[in-house]
Amino acid sequence: QCYVSQACFGRSANRGECAQFCRLPFSLVDADGKTIVRNKHLLSLKDLNQSEVLEELLDAGATSLKIEGRLKDVTYVKNVTAAYRRKLDAIFARRKEYTRASSGTCRFDFQPQLDKSFSRGFTHYFLQGRGGEITSFDTPKSLGEEMGTLKEQRGGYITVAGVKPFHNGDGVCFLDEQGRLQGFRINRVDGNKLYPAGEVPRIKPRTRLYRNFDQEFERILTRKSSERKIGVCWELADTSFGFSLTAADEDDNRVTLSFPYPKEPARTPQADNLRSQLAKLGNTPFEVAGHLSEEASGIRLNLSENWFLPASVVADWRRQVIDRLIVAPRVF
């Protein structure tokens, strides 16, 4: 816990109101009044990143993880949670003694990458012993992903030595000769030539260039690019007065509704049509568990005969059952 924000500004960092005291610039002066360091962010630490040691954390007994995300936007949260979700799922696939705390399956239409979201550089601090730089003295702002170095600068463009592609609209930053963070927005990209929007900043050759805003990546994240689906199993059965439809999800929630309906033998096989209708879960948080086959546990047809049931009737029953299942308690 940290109390410096409360002591200096009356805002408690332990209650989500940190005043970011540690991100301010300071000068370091010795006992003789000699300035050792001037106007550097001497208390600014890099961001904690334990994504590469998740398995060790699980083996040590960790059962939940806290992800840095105070005052971050939706694209940050989506990218970071997706990165950890994928790594954890890969561990769970190998280590059957571990299971996720919540139900469902998460899918992403993008490749998560932590250094594309806000970060001051990463550190694991002292989890694996002392070693490596943990501070970010030059700037408390986001550097982003390292893209290469400045090869040359002439006219209205700069040339980058690097293999990662830039996009129109990307944000680029660098540390100037005084160690101050500078940056510009790219107006146009032509191969490894970048044409900045506005005045071209003066950059020393071989200066490291970072991308702290990826236009294309942000565009992907702002649209629907992830979903979570909870597996559900169906059972359609006939009763003495009609039919019953049961849905059971991964959280052991179960809903059964009975529907009076006349029984009429069908002229053609109905199994495929019934499975198709029950599988249409659309924008609900559910999907059929398993595969749509006769042997699958996802959809079971417990019918004494090949009854005729119109698609519209089955669809209505399906909606009624799902509406009940949605409000059932579950772990998110």
Task: Locate predicted features.
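Surface-exposed amphipathic alpha-helical tracts and adjacent flexible/coil segments at the periphery
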Residues: Q1-F332
